[in-house]
């Protein structure tokens, strides 16, 4: 089975005090789904992670309770790559046909200063 990324979505990078990290993640997922011409209800699984923005699986509260399997991945700075690899493996194995990968965070000013 071939595996491809068919949609991408990003929330604007920068300060967004009016939005939580979770809301920014949901915005990115909606943009990716629109880019792919798909709907959240069509997704069979999701993998995602966040260090400080909340549990990624809680995005279902923003996107809709469809019953899909949402697995939290946490692997520090490699969370995005690990989530993509997990999704690739799930589709390549034939277990699923369509899914979402998302990563998001929101840090206070100066969070990366030593």
Where do the model's predicted regions map?
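Conserved "HGTGT" condensation-loop signature of ketosynthase/thiolase-family condensing enzymes
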Residues: 1-74, 89-93, 104-114
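Short conserved active-site loop signatures built around small residues
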Residues: 80
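Functionally engaged cysteine thiol sites
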Residues: 77
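A short, small-residue-rich loop immediately preceding and capping a beta-strand
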Residues: 97-103
């Amino acid at each position: 089975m071939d595996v491809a990324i068919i949609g991408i979505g990003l929330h604007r990078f920068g300060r967004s005090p009016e939005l939580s990290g979770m809301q920014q993640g949901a915005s990115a997922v909606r943009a990716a789904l629109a880019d792919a011409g798909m709907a959240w209800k069509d997704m069979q699984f999701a993998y995602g992670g966040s260090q400080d923005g909340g549990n990624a699986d809680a995005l279902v509260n923003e996107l809709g309770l469809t019953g899909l399997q949402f697995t939290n991945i946490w692997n520090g700075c490699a969370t995005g790559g690990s989530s993509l690899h997990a999704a690739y493996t799930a589709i390549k194995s034939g277990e699923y046909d369509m899914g979402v990968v998302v990563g998001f965070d929101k840090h206070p000013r100066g969070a990366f200063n030593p």
